[in-house]
Each structure stands twice: as C-alpha cells, then as structure tokens.
C-alpha cells in the first residue's frame, strides 16, 4: 500500500507539471480545496462543544460524571504553502500543512475540572481538484497525505490517581506516524449552492511493527501491552449543504455531515484480542456565511457512537456522545 501511495503522489506531481503551462502559481495562498468535512474525526475546524457522555474509561477517578456535561474543544489551522490554478483546464492543485488539537475536559467537576485527554496532530497534505461539465458531478478530487503525526495523552489527575490507587492501571502513550489517501466527488471548495458531497479514504502506519502506541514500564507497573496489529483505518463521509429550500438561505447554510469510520479497537491485554469497530460521527445544523471576513460561524448538534475516539481510551466500546457544537472556520 505504501508503494501505491508513493506512486499516486508522484503521479499527482507529474500531472501538475504537465498542467503547469498557462497556470497561475501562488505561494502561501488559500486554495479552499479538499478541506475536511465538518464530521471528519481529525477536522481542523475550531469547535467548542458541550456534551453528555454515557461512559468513560473504567479507571477514571470519579464515577458521578454521567450526570453532568463535558466540554470538548477543537483548535486547528491549515497553513497553505503552494497553490496552482489553471482556469482553462478547470484544475486546482495545492500543498499545505495542518495542525490541530482536541481537548476533552470535565469542566464541571468541582475539585480540579481536569483535562481528561489531549490529542494533537499535524501533517503535510497535497490536494487536486478537477472541475467537470456535469449538472450532478461538479468536480472530482484527490487528497494525499504522505505523512502525519498524531499523539495523545491522558490528564495528570487521571494518571496520578490511576498509578497510585489502581493496581491494574497502565498509562499507554498513543503516538504514531501515518499516511492517508482519499478521493472525493463534489468537493465544496468555494461552492455556496446546494451540493451533496462524498469522500472515501484510507490510512495506514509508516511503522507497522511499532503500532499505534507504546508503553513505559515505569507507567505500567512493569506490565506489558501487546503492540497493535491491524494498523489501518478507512472511512466514508457524506456532506450535504443547502442554501436554497426549506429553512436555509444564501447567508444561512444548512449542513448535514456524517462520517462512518472503521477503526481499530485497542487491546492492552494478551488474553483479549483486538477488534475492529464501525463508528458514526454526525453533525446537523446551520452556519452563517460571512462574505466580508471569509470565515463562517455555525451552531450544530453532534452525535457520536462507537469506540471512545480519544487516544488511550480507544479500547472502550459502546460510547455515546451527544451535544451542541459552536463552530468557527
């Protein structure tokens, strides 16, 4: 699969060279193409969410959390490097970097309001979009991420309590480098009209033998955790945007975005086999389109079901998350 990724990356670069004649070239200019859908689990959109959870890791140091709301904060940015535009051939190509951070916070816990999990990721992305003359298919796109890094850490209160009080507690460091490839039909780009978009993608690890996580004997009380084996994930995403029709307008866009991803459910015990899990991430709501600033503000309902998506807790299934999300991007 790595050879396929490398071949695809080289092919995309060769296409850019061939299309380079009569093209416009820009440095550090936003291309707007192949941005993450709102429901993408590793989205770079800025979000503040207040939500209800049905469960957490069994080692969490308090057990009354189900009766209060939690906060999840997403901070992210995409930094453009290069943008090619060929108006005659209706073709766009861009290279950018991105970085984001996700915090899960027990904000209304009375003692310390602890950060439960910190997740950050960054990578390099190449994207290409070709517009076609079809009333239903506006464009076709390809996204290649030759490398991205993700790392997650549980909060100090969580880990200190677990290490001091729980005999079987282990702190697992989820940290890995991966690659990703995705194809899209009807990338939203700068389109503001009604549009149904679809994306499929796949990612794998560069170091398959290391897996998604490592352990330190000082943090696991000399217990071992087997390395992960099924080190890949894939997803399908659908994104519907409407500015014409019921309960929407040119300035108030209705968005329904959903991702179904198949991810590895971790196992830190030799006796328990790791397994795979289908997970759903759904956003439904509206965003206000600002023509002057180029940024949009939206209010959405979010629902997630599957394994806990946060780092070390990906060994826990049956997770439900429902709440309101204030989005700025």
Predicted features and spans:
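Boundary at the C-terminal end of the N-terminal hydrophobic targeting segment
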Residues: 18-20
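Transmembrane beta-barrel domains of Gram-negative outer membranes and organellar outer membranes
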Residues: 22-130
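Outer membrane beta-barrel transmembrane domains
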Residues: 208-329
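Outer-membrane pore/translocation modules
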Residues: 91-242, 303
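Short loop/turn motifs that connect adjacent beta-strands in outer-membrane beta-barrel proteins
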Residues: 22, 29, 37-38, 82-95, ...
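Sec-dependent N-terminal signal peptides
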Residues: 4-14
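Membrane-embedded beta-strand positions in outer-membrane beta-barrel channels/transporters
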Residues: 70-78, 123-125, 178-182, 233-239, ...
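Transmembrane beta-barrel strands of outer-membrane/channel proteins
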Residues: 48-54, 95-101, 142-148, 198-206, ...
């Amino acid at each position: 699969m790595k050879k396929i990724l490398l071949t695809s990356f080289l092919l995309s670069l060769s296409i850019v060279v061939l299309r380079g004649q009569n093209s416009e070239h820009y440095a550090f200019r936003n291309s707007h193409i192949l941005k993450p859908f709102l429901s993408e689990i590793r989205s770079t959109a800025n979000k503040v969410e207040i939500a209800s959870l049905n469960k957490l890791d069994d080692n969490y140091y308090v057990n009354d959390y189900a009766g209060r709301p939690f906060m999840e904060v997403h901070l992210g940015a995409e930094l453009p490097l290069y943008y090619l535009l060929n108006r005659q051939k209706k073709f766009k190509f861009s290279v950018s970097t991105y970085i984001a951070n996700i915090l899960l916070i027990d904000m209304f816990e009375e003692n310390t309001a602890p950060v439960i999990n910190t997740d950050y990721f960054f990578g390099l992305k190449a994207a290409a979009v070709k517009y076609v003359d079809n009333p239903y298919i506006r464009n076709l796109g390809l996204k290649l991420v030759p490398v991205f890094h993700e790392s997650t850490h549980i909060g100090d209160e969580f880990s200190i309590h677990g290490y001091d009080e729980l005999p079987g507690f282990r702190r697992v460091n989820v940290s890995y480098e991966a690659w990703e490839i995705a194809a899209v039909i009807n990338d939203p780009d700068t389109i503001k009209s009604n549009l149904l978009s679809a994306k499929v993608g796949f990612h794998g690890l560069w170091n398959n033998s290391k897996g998604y996580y490592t352990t330190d004997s000082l943090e696991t009380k000399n217990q071992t955790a087997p390395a992960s084996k099924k080190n890949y994930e894939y997803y399908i995403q659908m994104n519907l945007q409407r500015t014409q029709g019921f309960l929407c307008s040119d300035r108030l866009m209705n968005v329904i975005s959903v991702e179904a991803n198949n991810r590895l459910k971790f196992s830190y015990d030799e006796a328990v086999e790791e397994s795979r899990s289908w997970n759903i991430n759904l956003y439904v709501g509206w965003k206000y389109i600002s023509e002057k600033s180029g940024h949009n503000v939206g209010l959405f309902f979010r629902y997630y079901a599957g394994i806990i998506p946060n780092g070390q807790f990906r060994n826990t299934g049956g997770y439900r998350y429902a709440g309101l999300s204030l989005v700025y991007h």
